[in-house]
Design a protein with these regions (language model features):
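Short, small-residue-biased leader/transition segments that mark boundaries at the very start
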Residues: 1-7
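Alpha-helical interface subdomain recognition
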Residues: 12-15, 20, 28-29, 36-182
Length: 182
């Protein structure tokens, strides 16, 4: 389950040795170096989750316009309209939050708080948008025949990568306290 929208293969590396001149950074400090890039990683994850939500939304909206029930396209039903509206609101909010974080990073403003907020909100909302898209498709939405289902699987996985949603709450909580208690 997951990684349905990407090609993946395995690579095994055993007993590898390299010259000190080939090291990136300092030997034994890999995790500390990696931590410096977590915030950027979170933005990249957010961008991918947003893309999944947008793809699922596009497919759901097209399907709702084409699928006919009771002699009318299903988008004319209020429940479908509400779902599409809520999905679009989430997508717009995700875009705004991601663009804000990217702008802050580009302008050398700390994104420790905002990247955690973005990661938690965008990955959670993307999964919700994809879930609603699956619902609009009905039974076929649950199968991997629809892109919406594959998007849901991948978006759900983004809630773990780069730090779980629970870890994002921990990071954001500490930063919020610092922000308001200067």
């Amino acid at each position: 389950m997951g990684s349905e929208m990407c090609i993946r293969d395995r690579m095994y590396i055993d007993n590898v040795e390299c010259d000190d001149s080939c090291l990136v950074g300092e030997c034994g400090k890999g995790f500390l170096q990696l931590m410096q890039n977590f915030e950027i990683e979170r933005l990249l994850i957010c961008a991918q989750a947003l893309g999944l939500a947008e793809a699922a939304m596009e497919d759901a909206a097209k399907y709702a316009a084409q699928r006919v029930q009771f002699n009318q396209p299903i988008y004319k039903f209020q429940q479908i309209q509400q779902m599409l509206t809520d999905m679009e609101i989430k997508i717009v909010n995700m875009q705004n939050l991601l663009y804000k974080c990217a702008w802050e990073h580009d302008n050398n403003i700390s994104i420790r708080l905002d990247s955690a907020l973005a990661k938690r909100y965008i990955c959670k909302s993307a999964t919700e948008v994809c879930s609603d898209a699956m619902q609009i498709f009905g039974g076929i939405g649950y199968t991997t025949e629809t892109r919406a289902s594959r998007c849901w699987q991948d978006s759900r996985g983004w809630q773990f990568a780069g730090g779980t949603n629970e870890v994002m709450v921990h990071i954001a909580g500490r930063q919020i306290i610092k922000k308001y208690n200067k």
